[in-house]
Every structure is written in C-alpha cells, then in structure tokens.
Amino acid sequence: TLQYVLPWAEAGILDVDANNAVVKELGKKTFAPGALNMAKKGSKIAAVPVDGWTQMVVYRKDLFEKAGLEPPTSYENITKAVEALSGDGMFGFVAATKTDENFMSQVLEHVLLANGVNVVKKGAIRKQGKKLKASLEFYKVIANASPPGELYWKQSRELYFAGKTPMIIWSPFIMDELAGLRDSAPPTINSDPTSGELASKTGFITNLKGPNNNKGAAWADVRYFGITADADTEEASAFIKYSMDEGYTKTLSIAPEGKFPVRRGNSSDPEAFTKAWSKLPVGVDRKAPLSDLYSED
C-alpha cells in the first residue's frame, strides 16, 4: 500500500529505476495522475500503481428521503440526520471507536481531511487549531450516537445490515455482501439473507465536507506493485507488465468492488480497463456485476 512505497524506496528496499521503467513502458498517461504523484521519488515513480478504492459514507437513502433530510455530504447534514433518526432501536451512527484498529485511523483521517485538516504537514496541528477542534467535535457527535463499546468495521457492518443504523463509514468492499452475495456476512434486515433489498435502499457518498472546507475531501487507498532491489528484475517486470496489461482485468476481478482501476486504459483505448472493470462480477457465493446491483449515480 501507499504507506510503504516511499519509506521502502528511501531505505533501498525498492528498485526505483526498475519500477519507473515499467510505468514508462506501460505509458504514464494511461495511469491516474494522482496514483503516480503519490509514489514519486524525485522525478521517478517508485512503485507501479495497481488499483485503489475510495472510502464512503454508506447511508439509508430511503430513511433520509422519508425524513426530508439532505444526503450526508457534510458535517452539518450528518449531524441533522443523527438528531432526526436516532431512537426506537436505531443508532444515529456507528462510528469507529476502537483506537488500536487501523479502521479508526482511516475513518478519523477522512473526517479530518473533510474539514481541511492536514495532520502530516509540519506545524499543522498548531496552525489549524480551529479546524481540528471542529473536526474532533463532529467526531464526538457521531461517536456519541453510536452504541457503547469499542467499535470497528465489524460492528458497523453488522448494525447497518440489521437495519439498526442509517449511516456508517466503510470501504466499497461492503458492496457485494450488502447485495446478499456473501453467505458469511449476509444482510439481516429481513428473513432472506440473499435479498438485495438493503442494497436498493442504500446510497453512497465519497466526498465529505466540514464547515471550514467547502470543497470537502475524499479518502482513498491505493495499492502498488514494487520490484525490490534483490529481485529478478526481468521476471518481476514481466509479471507486473502482464498483470497491468493483458492480465489487468483478471487482476481487478479478484475483488472488483474494492479494486478500482488506476490504469484506465491503453494506447488503443484510453478507457479499456475502466469499461471492462464495470462489467466484472462481484460476490463470493453468488455473483453479479456492480452495474446490475447499483445505479451509476
């Protein structure tokens, strides 16, 4: 993942020249610019971007519409929804509260970015006190709306699937089981674990905004292939080039709901892989294309 790319490049674990050569051969212009820029070491690309996903606010659009609420695109809208939809066995939100789980870091980072808080920049905490305070106060709102205890991805998914919360923050890896395609994690909102009812009532928001950042922000995770300094460079390069070109659709098919193509196409068709990905079946025990399960919007 991205968190290892530059540290491993700095430590000499990655062969930056070899990885950069693969990117150049595949064609820099065929990759999403952001995925390349995040892996830059000087003028070179330290690892080859493979795929990524964007974190989402997953919400019950049917309950929002019934209550006359705006979609949860902002701190303000989420706070209003928490107030309106809490009670009668319904938790207004299920936030991540287990501090030693990476999931909480992901959710908290998304909330901070939404309000324009940069915790990586040197001196940022002191200079962004107002934004940071607003972000933490908002996180307190969604944490207080949640059940007691240490919560992470497991509880948020279970409670959403049971119809006991109108909002959670999750990755798109939830999309196949949400549609009743995975027996080990079925929706329990009704008596049919294979039902697509909950999926049909669910909306997704990727860009969240706080009061100090009107543009908002998304949180994404990108995965990379990396040729190491002690690898058989020729063999490793050949494997990556196959996996990112002729075999790229197969690479994405491992879990299409969470493996969005960061290489959109090739020299023949700039959207070839995006189009192929949209038709890939998702699911474990049953399969269907995402385009059959969810509308484009």
Put a short name on every predicted segment.
Residues L2-T54, T79, M104, T194-T206:
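Hinge/lid segment of periplasmic solute-binding proteins
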Residues K41-V50, Q55, T79-A124, K131, ...:
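Extracytoplasmic/periplasmic solute-binding protein
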Residues K44-I45, G87-G92, G163-P166, L198-G203, ...:
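Loop/turn elements at helix/coil->beta-strand transitions in domains of secreted/extracellular proteins
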Residues Y75-K80, G149-A162:
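Short helix-initiation/N-cap motifs at beta->coil->alpha
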Residues E177-P186, N190, T194-E197, G210-D297:
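C-terminal lobe and pocket-closing loops
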